[in-house]
Structures are given as structure tokens and as C-alpha cells.
Amino acid sequence: MAYVINDSCISCGACEPECPVNAITAGDDKYVIDAATCIDCGACAGVCPVDAPQPE
């Protein structure tokens, strides 16, 4: 399983530096998690102020 960032993302960028495998990048409207790279650690979810990263 991987995490996905839902539409509540405010593009604050808090999640990107927390990802230990660099699976998070800035998208057009929100940040995006590469499911093939994500290791399901939940680090992104732990720092997100709006709980946008959710388990897929």
C-alpha cells in the first residue's frame, strides 16, 4: 500500500522533506506521492496540517 495526497492539500510543502525515499513532489495543484516509491511509512501524514496524505 502507498499513501496518496487528497484534494485537501494546501501545497504547504511540509510533507516533502519528511519522506525518507523522496517519493513526494510538487504537482500542479497539490503535492503528489509516487506510489511505486512510497514505503508506506506515514511520515508525510504525521506532519501534514490538513491530513491530506491518506493510505491508498
From Swiss-Prot:
Keyword flag Coiled coil: no
InterPro entries associated with the record: 4Fe4S_Fe-S-bd, 4Fe4S_Fe_S_CS, PSI_iron-sulfur_center
Segments forming domain 4Fe-4S ferredoxin-type: 2-29, 29-56
Superkingdom of source: Bacteria
GO CC field: cytoplasm
Residues the entry annotates as binding [4Fe-4S] cluster 2: C19, C38, C41, C44
Keywords in alphabetical order: 4Fe-4S, Electron transport, Iron, Iron-sulfur, Metal-binding, Repeat, Transport
The protein's required cofactors: [4Fe-4S] cluster
Protein name: Ferredoxin
Organism: Acetoanaerobium sticklandii (strain ATCC 12662 / DSM 519 / JCM 1433 / CCUG 9281 / NCIMB 10654 / HF) (Clostridium sticklandii)
Upper taxonomic lineage: Bacteria, Bacillati, Bacillota, Clostridia, Peptostreptococcales
